[in-house]
Regions:
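Short, basic/hydrophobic alpha-helical segments
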Residues: 60-81
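RNase H-like polynucleotidyl transferase catalytic core
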Residues: 25-30, 103-125, 141-144
C-alpha cells in the first residue's frame, strides 16, 4: 500500500483551441482548490488494485483504509501481508488510536506488516502502481475531490 498527496487545480481561463483540430492550450495560471490524499492498495498476483481519495492523510485515515481492506475486501482471510513504506502513520498503533481496543486488536492481529527499506521505495509495488496511475489518469488538472474520486474509480475499473 502507498499514498500520495494530490493538489486539486482548476483552470483560471478556459483552455483555447488555437486552430480547429489542434490540442487545446492550457494557461500556465491555475486556481488552487486544495489538497487531498490518494491511497492505493495492490495485490500484484491477483492483478487487483483499490484506490480511494481522502481529505487528509492522518493516522485515522490510514486506520480507516486498513479497516476497509480487512473487513470489506478480505473479510475471509486470517492474515494479510502488508508491504509499505515506514511513514509515521503506518503503524498498528494508529489502529488503537482510531478504534476501540477490541476492534483495533482484531484488526492488528490480522496484519503482517513489512516495511520497505529507506531508499528502497522501488520495492513497493503500490508506489509503482501510483506512478502508472499518475501517468494514465492524473495527466490533467482536476479541481474537485468528487471528480477526482470518480476518475480514479474509472481507472481502477479499467485496470482491474
Amino acid at each position: 500500500m502507498d499514498e500520495k498527496p494530490y493538489q486539486l487545480l482548476g483552470e483560471a481561463r478556459e483552455p483555447l483551441e488555437i486552430r480547429p483540430g489542434d490540442t487545446k492550450k492550457l494557461d500556465s495560471e491555475y486556481i488552487r482548490c486544495g489538497t487531498c490524499s490518494i491511497f492505493v492498495f495492490t495485490e500484484p498476483l491477483a492483478d487487483y488494485r483499490h484506490v480511494s481519495v481522502r481529505q487528509h492523510r492522518t493516522k485515522r485515515d490510514w486506520a480507516e483504509e486498513i479497516r476497509y481492506l480487512l473487513t470489506e475486501i478480505y473479510p475471509e482471510h486470517e492474515k494479510i501481508i502488508l508491504v509499505m513504506d515506514n511513514l509515521n502513520t503506518h503503524t498498528k498503533a494508529s489502529l488503537y488510536q482510531s478504534f476501540p481496543a477490541k476492534e483495533a486488536a482484531a484488526l492488528a492481529n490480522r496484519l503482517e506488516i513489512h516495511y520497505t527499506p529507506k531508499h528502497g521505495s522501488w520495492l513497493n509495488i503500490a508506489e509503482i502502481e501510483l506512478n502508472a496511475m499518475t501517468r494514465q489518469c492524473l495527466d490533467r488538472r482536476i479541481d474537485d475531490i468528487q471528480k477526482l474520486s470518480e476518475e480514479l474509480s474509472a481507472w481502477e475499473s479499467r485496470r482491474n
